[in-house]
Amino acid sequence: GCITGMSFYILLSFLFKLDSFFCILTLIIKTKNIDENKSMMEQIENKDILLSYPFESMTSFINLLKEVAHNENVASIKMTLYRVAKNSQVVEALIDAAEHGKEVVVMVELRARFDEQNNIEWSRRMEDAGCRIIYGIDHTKVHSKICLITYTKDNKVKHISQIGTGNYNEKTSKLYTDLSLMTANEEIAKEVGKVFNKICMEEVMEKTKHLLVSPKCMQNKIADLIDGEIKKVEEGKTGYIGMKFNSLTDKVLIEKLIEASQKGVKIDLVIRGICCLIAGVKEYTENVTVKSIVGRYLEHSRIYIFGTEDDRKIYISSADLMTRNTVRRVEVAAPIYDENIKKRVSKMFDIMLQDNIKGRYMKSDGKYYRPEIAEGETLIDSQEYFFEEAYGKIE
């Protein structure tokens, strides 16, 4: 029989690299606002740094690990690993650090689906090099993406934390959209340290002030943040919620979002995959928009926004709003405190909402439709926009 439609493209995918069908977008190596010739540690001490993959390279984070491995003032590195590349520079840097006398503690999740064998092999190599390997918590997957560096400077103990939305994987950092925050904020470092300590004791966080940490301190805190926006509306102010993740199935949070919509909170959701909330239903979700973006790169970053520009709380997270993530895994969401980074993430979210090329909107029938484009309206492909921005073509 003849080959038609999707079958044709699936067949082609086995014959050619998919890159053959795309124009070449050279991945940027140097990141704006980062000086590759200066110490990454000092630059992070000076100000928080946010990397946006694949539009910016993971090289800056790898350079941080390499610097830390050889810095005599560094005492320890702690990291959670879920999926890593076959030839991981990240793991090689951790091995290098251990061989240079640093205390290296690595939580390796052996239940990462399809990566079990790779993780076992890397675990053995790291153990042989002197790293302390922890294999997680019974019945609770560790899916968080966190790294904590402890060092001394001016006779004081200091820390650098890295918290991300995606894996420490150089290969997927070129294929998935993700965010990575590096900060010297000691309050955040204190809580990241507690997360590691709890994992080592096979326990979970019961209380946090800055981070959102599942399975005990995320779902309820997100519900509280939603309640905060409802309260604003009840006081005659503007309530707003903007969220981006891969899937939405958490019934508790779906019901909270419906309640917020009914009270008049404006809600924008960018959800690539499964969404168990139907937008635009009269008297229920009239104030909710749901958009899916499927482009050249896999949308993978998770962003939580609460409030308008004057009073806005922003988090980046490893967690989708699925019950498996919010109550059955260890996930970490980090607040963005740097005002410039808050503006940047807000702008990124706004550009995604404006995407009228790769974006599709859900209507009240639960189906997705192309946006109607008015004559003369600017065409926006959010992923292409972010690439051009990274190259300095867009200010």
Model-found features: residue ranges?
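Hydrophobic alpha/beta core scaffold segments
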Residues: 266-270
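N-terminal localization/anchoring segments of enzymes in phospholipid and broader phosphate metabolism
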Residues: 1-241, 259-263, 275-395
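NTP/phosphate- and nucleic-acid-binding module
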Residues: 250
